[in-house]
Regions:
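Register position in tetratricopeptide repeats
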Residues: 11, 46, 82, 116-117, ...
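Canonical positions in the second alpha-helix
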Residues: 25, 59-61, 95-96, 129-130, ...
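Short coil turns that delineate tetratricopeptide repeat
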Residues: 30-31, 65-67, 101, 135, ...
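Start-of-helix register in tetratricopeptide repeats
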Residues: 34-35, 68-71, 105, 139, ...
Length: 282
């Protein structure tokens, strides 16, 4: 009867009753503890009693199969995240890798945590494991490119950028990254090659592709075409500061600084925070 009540209260999310019944069942038969502690921990999580859930799960994980250990470590990590303790959350995610080194879900989670914490070396290491086990997706490769650039591993960044384009031939973020990298490397030949590839992309009318093509045309010396595209962006998005920002950058490349300043002022008028973007692009 108690087991049926337990199932009922779990379904109803009446976690106080769930915990009460589990405690009674364990008192009646202590040997049932190992099979009930995880359910108790889940109920404690439902009540947002994360620290108590962690304590319960640690007891449960002492004497269970590797499969159940992984399950408990995932929930412990989740509890620590809810307690804003990423360091301990990461510790338990790593414990999962000790049991299952090719767990792609955990590798992705750890790589993302490393990425947002700007631990670029660790992020690279984890994503390379995902690549090795053939579980890396476009987002993983994109994060890897950024990390490689931050670590001044330009050859690796370029190699992985080409891999992303191979997987997704219309990935605009990677094309934009390639133009910046080749421009910084003063590799005019490669820059022009990328710009030609950008121009060949289908124009789907989005702001990003229009501005990217405007920039590409200017790099290829097609000034009139570049301004046709940036003016098209302004016409389609008159209240968006980024077309004005791009137009200013195009004017700057042509040493037309007065015209550039007018565009920057208009972008700033539309969004004063646009200065942050200008600093990143400068």
């Amino acid at each position: 009867m108690s087991e049926k009540l337990l199932d009922y209260f779990e379904k109803e999310k009446n976690y106080d009753e769930v915990i009460k019944i589990i405690d009674e069942l364990i008192l009646e038969d202590p040997e049932k503890a190992s099979s009930l502690l995880f359910r108790k921990a889940e109920a404690l999580v439902g009540l947002k009693k994360y620290q108590q859930a962690i304590t319960t799960l640690k007891v449960y994980a002492k004497d269970c199969s590797d499969k159940d250990k992984i399950k408990s470590y995932v929930l412990i990590a989740s509890c620590y995240m809810n307690l804003d303790n990423d360091e301990m959350a990461e510790k338990y995610l790593v414990k999962i890798l000790d049991i299952d080194p090719e767990n792609d879900i955990i590798l992705k989670q750890l790589s993302y945590m490393a990425y947002i914490n700007q631990d670029f070396e660790r992020c690279c290491y984890l994503i390379k494991i995902l690549i090795k086990i053939d579980k890396a997706d476009i987002e993983d490769y994109t994060n890897l490119i950024f990390c490689c650039i931050q670590l001044d591993m330009i050859d690796d960044a370029l190699k992985n950028a080409e891999k992303v384009i191979e997987l997704d031939p219309t990935n605009l973020d990677v094309f934009a990254t390639l133009t910046i990298v080749y421009e910084n490397l003063d590799d005019e030949e490669k820059l022009k090659e990328v710009c030609k590839r950008i121009i060949s992309l289908k124009d789907d009318g989005t702001l990003q592709i229009i501005l990217l093509k405007a920039q590409a045309y200017l790099e290829l010396g097609k000034k009139q075409k570049a301004f046709e595209f940036v003016n098209k962006a302004i016409k389609l998005n008159p209240y968006d500061p980024f077309p004005y920002l791009m137009k200013g950058l195009l004017y700057n490349k042509l040493d037309m600084h007065d015209e550039a300043e007018e565009c920057f002022n208009e972008a700033f008028r539309l969004n004063p925070e646009i200065l942050d973007s200008m600093e990143k692009l400068s």
